[in-house]
């Protein structure tokens, strides 16, 4: 099973990716992880990427595509893979197509912006342990305090409303063209066309996961 997972920040992609990977015995692949691993291993592509990143520049699509090809040739990709946060652009999507790297399904988790803002703005974190609470959905026993240590909880900068709205704006700007690219390709069919699956990301984690898995099992 080869899957591309799309969805806004705060949509629960990480949780759902883990469920998909477990069900189909496939690895979750993100470009960030690939870059870090290649730089750490000192591979030729990793060295190229390090030079670019050290100069404060964006890593080119050519390098990213090279890393993707290397990564999906690894033995753990025998059953497929899940791309998380890749492709980010039409150029990268076209690059996958040109390399003959086809996927079975593109899953888009849709959540209204206001729901995302509410979810993320309500998150509170215990810095020492990383324990996460939510003021409405998973509140601590005592307001503003960690259940285990009693230490104060904080709101991460990333979870503040203004930041969340900015990130959502960037997501829509970047991802809408990809949504159209893959949904059009799926509708037209043809060689290598994936199924395009839209999942409403509202409801319990288990409910959303079950809906995704039942759709993927038909892909």
From Swiss-Prot:
Set out the biological process GO terms recorded for this chain's protein: AMP salvage
Tell me the segments the record calls region Disordered: 129-152
Keywords from the UniProt entry: ATP-binding, Cytoplasm, Kinase, Nucleotide biosynthesis, Nucleotide-binding, Transferase
Q: What InterPro entries does this protein map onto?
A: Adenyl_kin_sub, Adenylat/UMP-CMP_kin, Adenylat_kinase_CS, Adenylate_kinase_lid-dom, P-loop_NTPase
TM annotation in the entry: none
Keyword Cytoplasm tagged: yes
What is the enzyme's main class? transferase
Q: Give the family, as the similarity comment puts it.
A: Belongs to the adenylate kinase family.
Q: Cite the NCBIfam families for this sequence.
A: adk (TIGR01351), PRK00279.1-1 (NF001379), PRK00279.1-2 (NF001380), PRK00279.1-3 (NF001381), PRK14527.1 (NF011100)
This chain's protein is named Adenylate kinase
